[in-house]
């Protein structure tokens, strides 16, 4: 059992180291994550990014360099690398954090960058977004700027399956700035409540009313049929029986 635990711990550590290496090297390419799959004949490495061409390189030169690094420095056997584009980069916290880092390196104003990115994430369909930029923003004293739009979950069960979080650091002349991005992806939380529109309520009432009228009509028809059967099967009175005997 101990050997099995060590195996999985070592495997997770290698994947974490590779993930950190790729995030540091390819943040300008909008690096979003990596998936490592072991096969009997080698290892398949799937890299997700906003701009795959920057990772592939000219004529696949960067891919060949990565394969050699994965094999010699991280111990992956026969790595086969595939680079895929992120389906919706505006809803990926890592991609958004890398965009903010690149814009800050170019000298953009941090508050404007945070507001523009928050608006862009909400336009992509997110329920909420929170962006925190901390460090020496304007003065020698460190402070932070927080931009929060929509509904953001920080605790609870919703965080596990709805919130995507990423942290990135960028080095500027004043010092190191920290970037934290939290995106609440479009999904229905457990406490979701939707108030129906008046038209929907009216339509629902009409539907219930028609169903009640049909049920009442069916009950009335069944009662009439049952009453007719009772009248047809009524027993003869004593006078009727005496008349039948005399006849």
UniProtKB/Swiss-Prot annotation:
GO terms for cellular component: cytosolic small ribosomal subunit. GO terms for biological process: translation. It comes from the Archaea. Pfam families: KH_2, Ribosomal_S3_C. Residues 226-247 are annotated as: Disordered. Transmembrane segments: none annotated. Keywords: Ribonucleoprotein, Ribosomal protein, RNA-binding, rRNA-binding. GO terms for molecular function: rRNA binding; structural constituent of ribosome. Residues 18-87 form the KH type-2 domain. Binds the lower part of the 30S subunit head. Belongs to the universal ribosomal protein uS3 family. Part of the 30S ribosomal subunit. HAMAP family: Ribosomal_uS3_A. This is Small ribosomal subunit protein uS3. It comes from Hyperthermus butylicus (strain DSM 5456 / JCM 9403 / PLM1-5).
């Amino acid at each position: 059992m101990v050997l099995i635990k060590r195996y999985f711990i070592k495997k997770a550590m290698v994947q974490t180291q590779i993930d950190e290496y790729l995030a540091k090297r390819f943040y300008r390419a909008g690096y979003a994550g990596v998936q490592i799959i072991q096969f009997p004949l080698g290892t398949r490495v799937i890299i997700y990014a906003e701009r795959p061409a920057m990772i592939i390189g000219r004529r696949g030169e960067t891919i060949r360099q990565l394969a050699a690094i994965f094999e010699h420095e991280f111990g992956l056997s026969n790595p086969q690398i595939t680079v895929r584009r992120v389906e919706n980069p505006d809803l990926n916290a890592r991609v958004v954090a890398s965009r903010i880092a690149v814009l800050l390196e170019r000298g953009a104003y941090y508050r404007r960058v945070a507001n523009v990115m928050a608006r862009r994430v909400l336009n992509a369909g997110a329920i909420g977004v929170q962006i925190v930029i901390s460090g020496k923003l304007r003065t020698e004293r460190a402070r932070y700027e927080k931009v929060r739009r929509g509904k953001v979950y920080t605790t609870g069960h919703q965080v596990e399956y709805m919130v995507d979080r990423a942290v990135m650091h960028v080095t500027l002349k004043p010092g190191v700035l920290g970037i934290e991005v939290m995106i609440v992806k479009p999904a229905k939380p457990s406490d979701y409540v939707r108030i129906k529109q008046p038209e929907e309520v009216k339509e629902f009432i009409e539907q219930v009313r028609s169903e009640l009228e049909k049920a009442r009509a069916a009950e009335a028809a069944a009662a009439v049929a049952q009453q007719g059967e009772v009248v047809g099967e009524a027993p003869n009175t004593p006078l009727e029986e005496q008349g039948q005997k005399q006849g």
